[in-house]
């Protein structure tokens, strides 16, 4: 018995030393559902906010969102900006890809008149602008789109066939060493969008990797893997994407949760669709056959009609959202178990 007590004391001392050296949340038990008390910004997806464990993306931290082309990376970040602006936050978008569409951003709820936008000429300029905005202490959310487009100045000024091995990785490593402490002090959320590349010659295991070296993987408090897993159809017409996001790293709550939601073209994340699905799953919305009911009142036959009813009754939708958030964020283990059950069913169906 004494041996177990000594082990417990030694473990507690080791955990205390690790947290003292590397910060709160550097190590935790996977089953520990107690999330850190950190200010967060909603992603616009209720399910993803719950999967993150703290109600959204954390302020004062670095976040990486990566995935294949057309998976919804920029849409998700624009949704974060829209939610941040609603909360009175100042947002900036560093558009290294030179591909930001202000009309599409406005459709997602972004106040484009108040959004700070920069289209830098090279990677060094982009990261210097990011550093200056963070140091100002006046900007709350900064999106960098994307790491792959942060081309080093030497590569731009060189000839097309020149070799520039490791330049971008060194640039990112140096920038993140400078930025991380300032981001924490300024309580600013910095989100890096990243692309996926294939490692050559990988016979076993996952050949996918992200650009820009390993520094961003280490410095990120949250890493989100976003994928398009299907199409949303209205009859024969495709009107959106079925999207799956997996939390592959999380320093603020247990990681490895995943969530599915819909991204509708020209509209963004389908919040009302999530309200219906999560409401039914957690018995806040009743489903009988094709009919959906809330508080004993029928709200529509079929999911599309129920979503339309919620869109026409925003007060009720807000009430339902608050109930779902209160229940799931108060009991994150319930949401985690529901995810595990869902994933198990999907695997059985696949087999």
Curated annotation (Swiss-Prot):
The keyword Nucleotide-binding applies. It holds the Pfam family RecA_C. Keywords: ATP-binding, Cytoplasm, DNA damage, DNA recombination, DNA repair, DNA-binding, Nucleotide-binding, SOS response. It is found in: Cytoplasm. It comes from the Bacteria. GO terms for cellular component: cytosol. GO terms for molecular function: ATP binding; ATP hydrolysis activity; ATP-dependent DNA damage sensor activity; damaged DNA binding; single-stranded DNA binding. One of its GO terms (biological process) is SOS response. ATP binds at residues 67-74. Its main location: cytoplasm. Can catalyze the hydrolysis of ATP in the presence of single-stranded DNA, the ATP-dependent uptake of single-stranded DNA by duplex DNA, and the ATP-dependent hybridization of homologous single-stranded DNAs. It interacts with LexA causing its activation and leading to its autocatalytic cleavage. Belongs to the RecA family. This is Protein RecA. It comes from Mannheimia succiniciproducens (strain KCTC 0769BP / MBEL55E).
């Amino acid at each position: 018995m004494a041996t177990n007590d000594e082990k417990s004391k030694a473990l507690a001392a080791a955990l205390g030393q690790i947290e003292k050296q590397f910060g709160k949340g550097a190590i935790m038990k996977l089953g520990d559902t107690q999330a850190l008390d950190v200010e967060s910004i909603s992603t616009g997806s209720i399910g993803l906010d719950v999967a993150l464990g703290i109600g959204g993306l954390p302020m004062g931290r670095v976040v990486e969102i990566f995935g294949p082309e057309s998976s919804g990376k920029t849409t998700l970040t624009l949704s974060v900006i829209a939610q941040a602006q609603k909360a009175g936050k100042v947002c900036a978008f560093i558009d290294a890809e030179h591909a930001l569409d202000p009309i599409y951003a406005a459709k997602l709820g972004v106040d484009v008149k108040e959004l700070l936008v920069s289209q830098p000429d090279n990677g060094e300029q982009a990261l210097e602008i990011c550093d200056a905005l963070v140091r100002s202490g006046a900007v709350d959310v900064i999106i960098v789109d994307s790491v792959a487009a942060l081309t080093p100045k030497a590569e731009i000024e060189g000839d097309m066939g020149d070799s520039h091995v490791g330049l971008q990785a060194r640039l990112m490593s140096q920038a993140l060493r400078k930025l991380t402490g300032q981001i924490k002090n300024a309580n600013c959320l910095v989100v890096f969008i990243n692309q996926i590349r294939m490692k050559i010659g990988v016979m076993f295991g996952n050949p996918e990797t992200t650009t820009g070296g390993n520094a961003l993987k280490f410095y990120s408090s949250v890493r989100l893997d976003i994928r398009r897993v299907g199409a949303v159809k209205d009859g024969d017409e495709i009107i959106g994407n079925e999207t799956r996001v997996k939390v592959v790293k999380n320093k603020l709550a247990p990681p490895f949760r995943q969530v599915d939601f819909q991204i509708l073209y020209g509209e963004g994340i389908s919040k009302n669709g999530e309200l219906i699905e999560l409401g039914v799953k957690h018995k806040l919305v009743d489903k009988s056959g094709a009919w959906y009911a809330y508080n004993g009142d029928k709200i529509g036959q079929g999911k599309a009609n129920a979503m339309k009813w919620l869109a026409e009754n925003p007060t009720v939708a807000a009430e339902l959202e608050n109930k779902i958030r209160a229940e799931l964020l108060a009991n994150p283990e319930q949401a985690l178990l529901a995810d595990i059950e869902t994933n198990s069913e999907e695997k059985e169906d696949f087999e």
